[in-house]
């Protein structure tokens, strides 16, 4: 099985003008569903090999309901000159079951808010190599926390119609309900709400969270929180649940941490 676009009209096209890209993002945001429509219970997603303590591992009511643990994919990129190297690592119960990568030439420079048009081609090419159908995808990048609610995780999630979560290191837009410059204990969640910088969403809407997945023991040092937002078919609260459940003593959730490492490994083979 390979994962191909369900909405080919949303495949990133770097030849579009910036105005056309932004208009496409508005269409993607309109198609995105920022609510839980996954085929697995969030409680079934764990960072270790322990079996989930839930009665059912699926939400589906179809006759062929699956009871096996969910497949969680992490996506990250590396760059070599004008080439993007996209890596996907799939885990099940904390074990790596598949790794794929793809290399595509980047056609445009980095433009804030238009990352998917620079990196999306390589990501979709990597998904085309994937034999596993992931239940949820964690993407290194923004989801709904975006000027038009269509960050990289949303663009990929909607195009493939797969539940997706954006995991970013920096806040692109929106207003946190508390300062992100303070030191917070592990597990702290700070809602990020839409403001005037988010043109497609009413002010005050919770579009994601700052999530403290790890913190130093020493009060004199601190680790900044991750910026977590729903990409597609996942709510803001569940997106944070998933990232927290898959963090394994590191700041990054295990799927994207391993994808980051594999992207660097794959990068070394690019000529």
From Swiss-Prot:
It holds the Pfam family Endonuclease_5. This is Endonuclease V. DNA repair enzyme involved in the repair of deaminated bases. Selectively cleaves double-stranded DNA at the second phosphodiester bond 3' to a deoxyinosine leaving behind the intact lesion on the nicked DNA. One of its GO terms (molecular function) is single-stranded RNA binding. Keywords: Cytoplasm, DNA damage, DNA repair, Endonuclease, Hydrolase, Magnesium, Metal-binding, Nuclease. Its cofactor is Mg(2+). It catalyses: Endonucleolytic cleavage at apurinic or apyrimidinic sites to products with a 5'-phosphate. Residues 46-67 are annotated as: Disordered. The lineage of its organism: Archaea, Methanobacteriati, Methanobacteriota, Stenosarchaea group, Halobacteria. Mg(2+) binds at residues 76, 140. GO terms for cellular component: cytoplasm. Its EC number is 3.1.21.7. The record marks 110 as: Interaction with target DNA. Transmembrane segments: none annotated. It is an enzyme of class 3 (hydrolase).
């Amino acid at each position: 099985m390979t994962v191909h676009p369900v909405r080919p009209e949303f495949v990133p096209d770097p030849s579009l003008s910036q105005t056309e890209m932004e208009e496409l993002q508005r269409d993607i945001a309109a198609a995105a569903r920022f609510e839980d429509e996954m085929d697995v219970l969030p409680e079934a997603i764990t960072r270790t090999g322990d079996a989930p303590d839930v009665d059912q591992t699926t939400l589906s009511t179809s006759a062929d309901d699956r009871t096996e643990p969910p497949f969680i994919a992490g996506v990250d990129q590396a760059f070599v000159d004008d080439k993007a190297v996209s890596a996907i690592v799939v885990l099940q119960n904390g074990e790596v079951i598949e790794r794929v990568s793809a290399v595509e030439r980047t056609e445009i420079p980095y433009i804030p808010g238009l990352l998917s048009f620079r990196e999306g081609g390589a990501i979709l090419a990597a998904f085309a190599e994937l034999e596993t159908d992931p239940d949820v995808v964690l993407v290194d990048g923004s989801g709904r926390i975006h000027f038009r609610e269509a960050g990289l995780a949303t663009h990929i999630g909607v195009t493939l119609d797969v539940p997706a979560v954006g995991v970013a290191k920096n806040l692109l837009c929106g207003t946190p309900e508390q300062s992100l410059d303070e030191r917070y204990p592990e597990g702290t969640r700070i809602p990020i709400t839409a403001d005037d910088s988010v043109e497609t969403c009413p002010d005050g809407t919770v579009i994601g969270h700052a999530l403290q997945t790890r913190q130093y023991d020493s009060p004199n040092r601190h680790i900044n929180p991750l910026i977590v937002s729903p990409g597609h078919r996942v709510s803001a609260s569940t997106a944070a649940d998933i990232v927290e459940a898959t963090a394994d003593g590191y700041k990054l959730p295990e799927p994207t941490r391993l994808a980051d490492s594999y992207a660097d490994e794959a990068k070394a083979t690019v000529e």
